[in-house]
């Protein structure tokens, strides 16, 4: 729908595509409030899967680049939200890590008035290390799984070339 111009009711995407050493003529019609119509060499295509055999494309919208531009903190937040939904143990470890981090921060802040609080730091550091190790393990496996999906998607989009 984003491809239809402002104030317009429809848009057309026409293309001559050379794929698998054959030429294909595609015609895609987009309508506001109606289903799109697609043909490949004049034959109606039932769905976009019919086009994917002929045309390997990736469509990027500005919001797709958000994770790249937003920085590491936003990428970690995305990963945390994803992993919390997928792995309850990750959610527990993240919650524990955040709790320990907050306590340690309070100890450091209050230690000026109560220096004896600094004796508690080794215990909090150990807990942070344990929870952090669990988080790092889950994140590493998550990144490896995403990398495999990305590799496969790149392979398919590039016409099965590396």
Task: Name each region found by the language model.
Residues 66-159:
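An accessory alpha-helical subdomain
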Residues 162:
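Short, hydrophobic-rich beta-strand element in sensory/regulatory alpha-beta domains
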Residues 2-68, 72-74, 80-86, 90, ...:
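Nucleotide-state sensing region of NTPase/ATPase domains
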């Amino acid at each position: 729908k984003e491809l239809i111009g402002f104030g317009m009711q429809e848009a057309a995407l026409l293309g001559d595509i050379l794929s698998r050493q054959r030429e294909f003529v595609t015609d895609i019609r987009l309508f506001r409030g109606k289903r799109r119509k697609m043909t490949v060499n004049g034959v109606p295509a039932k769905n976009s899967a019919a086009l994917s055999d002929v045309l390997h494309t990736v469509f990027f919208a500005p919001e797709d680049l958000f994770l790249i531009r937003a920085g590491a903190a936003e990428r970690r937040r995305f990963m945390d939200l994803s992993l919390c939904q997928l792995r309850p143990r990750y959610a527990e470890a993240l919650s524990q890590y955040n709790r320990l981090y907050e306590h340690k921060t309070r100890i450091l802040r209050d230690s000026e008035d109560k220096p004896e609080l600094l004796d508690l730091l080794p215990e909090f550091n150990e807990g942070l290390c344990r929870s952090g190790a669990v988080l790092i393990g889950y994140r590493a496996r998550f990144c490896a799984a995403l990398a495999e999906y990305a590799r496969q998607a790149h392979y398919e989009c590039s016409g099965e070339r590396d």
